[in-house]
UniProtKB/Swiss-Prot annotation:
F-box domain mapped to chain residues: 27-73
InterPro entries recorded: LRR_dom_sf
Gene3D superfamilies associated with the record: Ribonuclease Inhibitor
Protein name listed in UniProt: F-box protein At5g51370
Natural source organism: Arabidopsis thaliana (Mouse-ear cress)
Coiled coil: none
Length: 446
């Protein structure tokens, strides 16, 4: 063996193996505390923040500590307690889509607002969601695990829970502020009284084609007596009547926002809105009727704090109901009507009841005409801004001098009643919203 070969062999023997190098010699971040490393990771751009979990197991755990909001798709991940271990600091959790039995071989994805799931092509029952929901006992077990480990939970969305699951949640998560309950019923609401600090609540009773559940005056009364600190409330697919709505108005004294969606309430419920002393915003959407028989006019008192009335995708050919609604909300400064059918000139004339409207938005109101619009807004002395979009029966050629004079005084105007409107193009550069200067020309009006 030559001297050179001996030298090479000795060098190899003395060489330190790669796997014997201490981690501290190649990973300088090991000297940093978790809290300091978390602060460094938080400084990374949003596009790179998720990639840090690929570096090593420690960084994976740190990234899990940073996560605050999560939408779960696999309920077993919660039942195995891996969710709370992997993400210990969650404050916002959405369990709705995880509460369904998965269809492994289905390529059909059904979506309805916040719910999405795979649907079998041979399903013959239109209540397919109800038959594929996890049992309430399983849901409750998951809620117990979540509440036991997630003390900082602020917002939760869940479907098909029971009173027991809600009670365990309220007992451990005392800071819970927002709750969304799908497939809600009266029994479930019996346990909601334990959620003393709730500020926002969304109840979904029945959804056509998906599931059936009943929220009546009994459940609304439980809600009213238990959740007195509510600021925002949405009732979707709920039943009830004057008594249930009145109880909420009397007990929830700081309620500022009320949303009614696809209601199944008995006639006369609108009069109960008079009991809401702090209500500022009323939203009504996707309703087939407003209130066919609102009762005696003497019961219809104004909501003293009302600021905004918003109607979306509703049938407004119920004249008595519209009259009662406008009467109760006559102090609103903002009126927004979008994609509602049946809003005729006769029906819109009832809007003269509003006393101090400053902003009006009309979109997708295809029956309302220029004359019907004019007959109302000329009565509103405080009107400052207006938006008219996709209202095909409102024509530029039908604008009167009185209406054009009003337009010239508005601070803000969006005018696109249809795609053929010439007036919309003439508004550009007219100074609307800056000086309130007149922008109409004779050629526009004729």
């Amino acid at each position: 063996m030559s001297e050179f070969d001996k030298h090479v062999q000795n060098h190899i023997k003395n060489e330190k193996p790669f796997n014997s190098i201490k981690p501290s010699e190649i990973d300088s971040t090991l000297s940093l505390s978790d809290s300091l490393l978390l602060k460094i990771i938080e400084k990374l751009p949003e596009s790179q923040s998720n990639d840090v979990s690929l570096v090593c197991k420690r960084w994976l755990n740190l990234q899990g500590q940073r996560l605050r909001s999560l939408k779960l798709l696999d309920f077993d991940f919660l039942l195995s307690e891996r969710l709370t271990t992997r993400f210990p600091n969650l404050t916002h959790v959405d369990l709705v889509n995880a509460c369904m039995n998965p269809r492994v071989n289905s390529g059909i994805l059904f979506c309805h607002k916040s719910i999405s799931f795979h649907l079998s092509s041979d399903s013959s029952n239109w209540e397919f969601l109800e038959e594929n929901l996890l049992h309430s006992d399983v849901i409750d077990r998951g809620l117990r695990i979540l509440s036991r480990e997630s003390f900082d939970l602020l917002n939760l969305k869940v479907i098909n829970a029971s009173e027991l699951g809600l009670l365990s949640l309220a007992g451990d998560c005392s800071d819970l502020q927002e709750l969304e309950l799908h497939k809600c019923n009266d029994n479930l609401l019996h346990g909601i009284a334990a959620c003393k600090n709730l500020k926002g609540l969304r109840l979904v009773g029945s959804v056509d084609g998906l599931y059936s559940s009943s929220v009546s005056d009994i459940g609304l009364t439980f809600l009213a007596q238990g959740c007195r600190s509510l600021v925002k409330l949405e009732l979707s697919g709920c039943e009830g009547s004057f008594d249930g709505i009145k109880a909420i108005g009397q007990c929830c004294e700081v309620l500022e926002e009320l949303s009614i969606c696809d209601h199944r309430m008995d006639d006369g419920w609108i009069a109960a809105l008079s009991y809401f002393e702090s209500l500022k915003i009323l939203r009504i959407s996707s309703c087939r009727k407003i209130d066919a028989s609102p009762g005696p006019e003497k019961l219809l008192r104004s909501c003293p704090a009302m600021e905004s009335l918003q109607l979306k995708r509703c049938c407004l050919n119920d004249k008595e109901g519209i009259k009662a609604l406008f009467k109760v909300c006559d102090g609103a400064t903002e009126v927004n009507i979008q994609d509602c059918w049946g809003l005729s000139d006769d029906c819109f004339s009832l809007a003269k009841a509003f006393r101090r409207v400053r902003f009006l938005s009309l979109e997708g109101c295809s029956v309302l005409t220029s004359g019907g619009l004019e007959s109302v807004i000329l009565h509103w002395e405080e009107l400052e801004s207006m938006r008219v979009v996709s209202c095909k029966s409102i024509k530029d050629s039908e604008i009167s001098p009185a209406l054009s004079s009003l337009f010239s005084l508005l601070k803000e105007l969006t005018w696109r009643p249809d795609t053929r409107s010439h007036l919309s193009s003439s508004l550009e550069g007219a100074g609307i919203g800056i000086r309130g200067s007149k922008f109409f020309k004779k050629s526009v009006l004729h």
